[in-house]
Amino acid sequence: MNIESVVLPALEFMRLGGNGEPDGRFIRRNLCKYLRQHRKCSLFITQGYICRNAAGEIDNLQRGGSDYTASLIGAAVRAEEIQIWTDIDGLHNNDPRIVPNTVPVRLLSFDEASRLAYFGAKILHPLCIQPAEKHRIPVRLLNTMQPEAPGTLITECAEKGKIKAVAAKDNITYIKIRASRSLPAYKFISKVFGVFARCKTPVDLVTTSEVNISVAIDDPERLQEIVAELGKYAEVTVEKDMVIVCVVGDLEWHNVGFEARIIGALRDIPVRMISYGESSSNVALVMRSSDKSRALQALNEYVFV
C-alpha cells in the first residue's frame, strides 16, 4: 500500500507524574511536538504499556496498559474516536468462558463501561475510560478477526430502561465488622475507615448500619494487621475466596422491577452483601466463589429479557 509512516518512541512523551499517575499535560505537549515535525504523515506507530516515571526511569502502566496508552494518546490529540482492537467482538453481556450464547453489548455509557471493567470485564483496562470520558471522546471496541463487526461503542450517552451486562471480580475477601457496645456509632465508622486508610487498602464495596459495617476488598496483603486493629473495638468476621458479581445498566429508582429480577435470579444462592453504586448504574453482590458460575448463568437467564 506504500503508506508513509513514522515511529514515535513512547518513552519520549509517555510520563508518570510524581503521584504515579499519567501526566496529561506533559504527554500532550511532547506528543504534539513530535506530530508537528511530521505534518505530512498520516500514520504513526508507537509502543503501548511503557513510559517513564517522574524520575526519568523506565516504568510501565501495569496490566492492560496498552489500552490505557491508546486512551491517553487519544485524549492528548483530542481524537474523534479511540479504537481498541482485541480478539473478541466487543464487550459481551456476560462471561463467555462460563455462560454460553453471550452477545456483544452495542452501546455503553462511560460510567457503565468503567464499572464493568473494574468489576471483572477482561477486555478493557479499568482506567482507560477516564481520559476519554474527560474529553468526551467515544471509545470503540473492535475485533481484529472480524473487523467488519460493529463491536461496542462507549459514549457519554446511556440507553434508558435496560440492564446491559454482568461481570465478576474474583479473589475477594469479605469482612464483617460489628461494633462493641461501648463505642458510639459516629466513632465506630470513623475508626473502621481509619484502619483501612492507614493500611493503604482500598475498599471495593461497603454497606453500613449503626453498629455493623461490611466491606469487600481484593488486596489481602495486610489483612492480618487490619483484623488486629479492628478487633480492638469490634467483633470481626472474615470470609475468603469470595467473588463480586456486578450487574450494570439503567438502575434508577423509577425503573421498578430490575432489583426484583436480580434477586429472583439468585434466590437459591447465598448472598453475603448487596451494594448499590452511587451513580445508579450498577448493583454489586458478594457471594462464595463456588457459586459464581451458577450466579452468572442464572442472571443471564433472568435479567436479559
What do these predicted ranges mean?
Residues F110-T155, E159-R178:
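A conserved active-site cap/scaffold subdomain adjacent to cofactor or substrate pockets
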Residues H38-N53, A117-R136, R140, R178-Y186, ...:
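Electropositive, surface-exposed helix/loop patches at the edges of structured domains
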Residues P150-V305:
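A conserved regulatory-domain signal marking ACT and ACT-like small-molecule sensing domains
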Residues A10-F13, Y49-I50, T86-L91, P96-R97, ...:
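Short, ordered loop/turn segments at secondary-structure junctions
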Residues M1-L124, I129, M287-R288:
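Nucleotide/pyrophosphate-binding catalytic subdomain
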Residues E4-V6, I82, V139, V203, ...:
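Hydrophobic anchor at the start of a short beta-strand
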Residues G74, A132, L299:
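Residue-level signature of catalytic and energy-coupling elements of molecular machines
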